[in-house]
Every structure is written in C-alpha cells, then in structure tokens.
Design a protein with these regions (language model features):
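ATP-dependent carboxylate/acyl-activation modules
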Residues: 1-134
C-alpha cells in the first residue's frame, strides 16, 4: 500500500567531470559563491575557492584556475580539456542568482555539476537551496 505523491522522470546524464557550485550568505561578507571539484572530491580533497557575489566573468574564469584540480579541467593524462568557457558562464550566472536572491537564499549547492569536453557544455545533476526563515 504505497502512498505515492508524485514521480520524477528525467534523463540519465552521461558521465562528466564533477564540480560543485555553492553559496553561503555570510554575515560579514554577504552572499558568497564557492567552486571546486565536486562529488566525493569536495568531501575528501576540500579543494574549493570562494568569492563575494556577484563575480565578474573574469573572476569566474579565475576561480576555475584557483583550485588544485584545475589541471583535471584543462585535460591531463590523455583526457580532453573540459568546457571551461561554459563552466565560467555557469559560475557567473550562479553568482548573479545568489546575489539577486540574497534576501531569500540562506545557502545552496549544485553538486555534482557534470562538465563535458570542450564545446559540449555541462549539466547540473543535483541541486539544493535552503531558504532563509521568514
């Protein structure tokens, strides 16, 4: 006797390099955006970088280069470079969203974001947003 309130149907995303985008609305700095390698890597390596939101497009590109895992995104050991152009656009857009909704959002994360080979973009596989108490 299952009590089903709905179902979700979505495509199975192909494997990609996992990164994380996150945010915290900090009491001192205001809305901040975080970027790093995602999935289990963020838990094990904690290789992330933060900026105050909103970031510029140039700062979004810098964030990609700031992490130790930047070489993975650049392509290493025979792997093709990942789509860092679309990734920088995603960091920028995420940062703008966090800034624009800072009165509503306490914290958020998109993890994993699957980044594909250069020219093939990315997909958000999982995300959560925690709203501020009213």
């Amino acid at each position: 006797d299952a009590d089903i309130h709905g179902i979700a149907v979505q495509e199975m995303a192909p494997w990609g390099t996992e990164v994380i985008l996150g945010s915290v609305n900090d009491a001192a700095f205001g809305p901040t955006v975080m970027f790093g390698l995602g999935g289990i890597f963020v838990e094990v390596l904690k290789d992330v970088t933060f900026r105050v939101s909103p970031v510029t497009k140039s700062q979004a590109e810098e964030m990609i280069g700031d992490i130790k895992g930047a070489a993975i995104l650049a392509g290493t050991r025979g792997e093709k470079p990942k789509d860092r152009v679309e990734l920088a656009k995603a960091i920028y857009a995420y940062s703008c969203m966090i800034y624009d909704l800072q009165d509503e959002i306490k914290e958020s994360d998109a993890n994993p974001v699957l980044v594909y080979d250069e020219g093939n973009g990315l997909k958000v596989a999982d995300a959560r947003i925690i709203l501020k108490a009213k």
